């Protein structure tokens, strides 16, 4: 009787284990509300991606995420990677404040109250390095040459501090710098064999990288600030290709002036043009980020639109400052020699280049419909007409919110088509720019009241016909306020278009 009872108990336990076992896909745990707490209890360090099956960014991340999971598992690490389909597990998504996809959070020791937001890049090395920084020392102690070689081989970029006295002030400054950098592995050594292997005979810091010149030796007084500046100048390739994976490094970096080479990989002298661009980059490390964009790639077409370029106009070079204004600049010459690109960059840094403002040609029928069509060339004349109250939608053709607004805006135009001093208008801000208005989100709605003082009023009320009418009838008061929707920096990210069924949830970085 006892053995039979034990058998039943064993079968019941096996059934329970089978039901609660954590499913895996490509070494990534698949979590649901029913097993989320179990996963947190089982793993002290858990990185969780909240994703949507339709999300382009999530699809692009998947292979790198799996690669990171496999690498950590192969190393015998305590850290595990997991994923949650937020469209199926809406309670979990709401609990952890998921507003866009992918949202990635790091849970340490089962703490659900304050998980850490993942902030690094989207390549496997970025993920692994960020996690190791969160779970171990800021810098790994390298006791022999094998440990040093292993660290250098482990990532695209590594930094090693060589200090004969690990307790010196310089070593302490190095460790402070290591704590401040999330996405690069650091090592520290006092071992004489490691010094010899890397040709150092005194204290120093070396940045190792698997591209360009291979290594950079720090020179000067070792302080946290100077080390961070040294790393900023040398951690990225001279020329970085814009992709789904590199976008966080490009936008998240400290260098906010970017020069972009739009170059189809199929062009006959591809290597030569890229070589010229790279040669020019050598003189602007830490000042201007040099970015290459494959103009033939489908995912990059929106970036071309943003710069007012067509595929047939490439190769081409443009420069942009990613400050609040997001100002664009165009070279004086179409020649893509290293000398011309270098000259263009120098002229920009010296303040000798005027911003490049795009404009479409003015359509012949621009004023024939209830909603007037504005382009760069007629904007000033129409918007700042002293006798007219002009309400303008600044839109992007691909923007989901703009598409939803379109029929309402058309009705508004119909409502006021015969009004003597109210004009309803629209402007495609991906193809037209004006000095008087800087558009930072889509759609942006601005009111230009009839006056001589060039007043501009932002609209941020309800996007309904009644809301717009109240705003206009109140002279631009009822509904006035700052506008904040789809940020233009997101417009530069690949695969950002929203599907109708996405409920306007942004596919965020």
Curated annotation (Swiss-Prot):
Residues that the record marks as modified (N6-succinyllysine) are 224, 273
PTM sites of type N6-acetyllysine:
202
User: What GO molecular function annotations does the UniProt record carry, in alphabetical order?
Assistant: actin binding; enzyme binding; integrin binding; procollagen-proline 4-dioxygenase activity; protein disulfide isomerase activity; protein heterodimerization activity; protein-containing complex binding; protein-disulfide reductase activity
Q: Where is this site: Lowers pKa of C-terminal Cys of second active site?
A: 463
**Disulfide pairings:** 55-58, 399-402
Task: Kindly give the Pfam families that the UniProt entry links to this protein.
Answer: Thioredoxin (PF00085), Thioredoxin_6 (PF13848)
Q: How does it sit in the membrane?
A: Peripheral membrane protein
List the catalytic activities from the record. Answer: Catalyzes the rearrangement of -S-S- bonds in proteins
Where on this chain is Prevents secretion from ER (motif)?
A: 506-509
The biological process GO terms on file are: cellular response to hypoxia; cellular response to interleukin-7; endoplasmic reticulum to Golgi vesicle-mediated transport; insulin processing; positive regulation of cell adhesion; positive regulation of substrate adhesion-dependent cell spreading; positive regulation of T cell migration; positive regulation of viral entry into host cell
Q: Which keywords appear in this protein's UniProt record, sorted alphabetically?
A: Acetylation, Cell membrane, Chaperone, Disulfide bond, Endoplasmic reticulum, Isomerase, Membrane, Phosphoprotein, Redox-active center, Repeat, Signal
Q: Which residues carry this modification: Phosphoserine?
A: 333, 359, 429
Q: What NCBIfam families does the database record attribute to this sequence? A: ER_PDI_fam, pdi_dom
Report the protein name in the record: Protein disulfide-isomerase
Q: What organism, scientifically named, is this protein from?
A: Rattus norvegicus (Rat)
The lineage is:
Eukaryota, Metazoa, Chordata, Craniata, Vertebrata
């Amino acid at each position: 009787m006892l053995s039979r009872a034990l058998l039943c108990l064993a079968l019941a336990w096996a059934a329970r284990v089978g039901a609660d076992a954590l499913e895996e896909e490509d070494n990534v745990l698949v979590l649901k509300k029913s097993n989320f707490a179990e996963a947190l209890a089982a793993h002290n360090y858990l990185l969780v991606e909240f994703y949507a099956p339709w999300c382009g960014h999530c699809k692009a991340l998947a292979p790198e995420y799996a690669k990171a999971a496999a690498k950590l598992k192969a190393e015998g690490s305590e850290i595990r990677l997991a994923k949650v389909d937020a469209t199926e597990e809406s309670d979990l998504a709401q609990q952890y404040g998921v507003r866009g996809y992918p949202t990635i959070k790091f849970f340490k020791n089962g703490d659900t109250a304050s998980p850490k937001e993942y902030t690094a890049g989207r390549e496997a090395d970025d993920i692994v390095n960020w996690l190791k920084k969160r779970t171990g020392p800021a810098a790994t102690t390298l006791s022999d040459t094998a440990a040093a070689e292993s660290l250098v081989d482990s990532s695209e970029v590594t930094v090693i501090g060589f200090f004969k006295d690990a307790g010196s002030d310089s070593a302490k400054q190095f460790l402070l710098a290591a704590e401040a950098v999330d996405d690069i592995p650091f090592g520290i050594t006092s071992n004489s064999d490691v010094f010899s292997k890397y040709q150092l005979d005194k204290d120093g810091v070396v940045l190792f990288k698997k591209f360009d010149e291979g290594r950079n030796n720090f020179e000067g007084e070792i302080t946290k600030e100077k080390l961070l500046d040294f790393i900023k100048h040398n951690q990225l390739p001279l020329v970085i290709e814009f992709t789904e994976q590199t976008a966080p490094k490009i936008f998240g970096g400290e260098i906010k002036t970017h020069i972009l080479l739009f170059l189809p990989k199929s062009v006959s002298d591809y290597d030569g043009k890229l070589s010229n661009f790279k040669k020019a980059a050598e003189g602007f490390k830490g000042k201007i980020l040099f970015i290459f964009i494959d103009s033939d790639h489908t995912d990059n077409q929106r970036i071309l639109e943003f710069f007012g370029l067509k595929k047939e106009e490439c190769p081409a070079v443009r420069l942009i400052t990613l400050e609040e204004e997001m100002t664009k600049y165009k070279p004086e010459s179409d020649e893509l020699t290293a000398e011309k690109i270098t000259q263009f960059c120098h002229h920009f840094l010296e303040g000798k280049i005027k911003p490049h403002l795009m404009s479409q040609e003015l359509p012949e029928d621009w004023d024939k419909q209830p909603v007037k069509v504005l382009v760069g060339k007629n904007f000033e004349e129409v918007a700042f007409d002293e006798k007219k109250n002009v309400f303008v939608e600044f839109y992007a053709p691909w923007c989901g919110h703009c598409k939803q607004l379109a029929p309402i805006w058309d009705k508004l135009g119909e409502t006021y088509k015969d009004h003597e001093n109210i004009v309803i208008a629209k402007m495609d801000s991906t193809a037209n720019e004006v000095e008087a208005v800087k558009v930072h989100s889509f759609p942006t709605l601005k009111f230009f009241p009839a006056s001589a003082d060039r007043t501009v009023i932002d609209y941020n009320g309800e996007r309904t016909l009644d809301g717009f009418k109240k705003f206009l009838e109140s002279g631009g008061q009822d509904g006035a306020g700052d506008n904040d929707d789809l940020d233009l920096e997101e417009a530069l990210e690949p695969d950002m278009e929203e599907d109708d069924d996405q409920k306007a949830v942004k596919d965020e970085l």
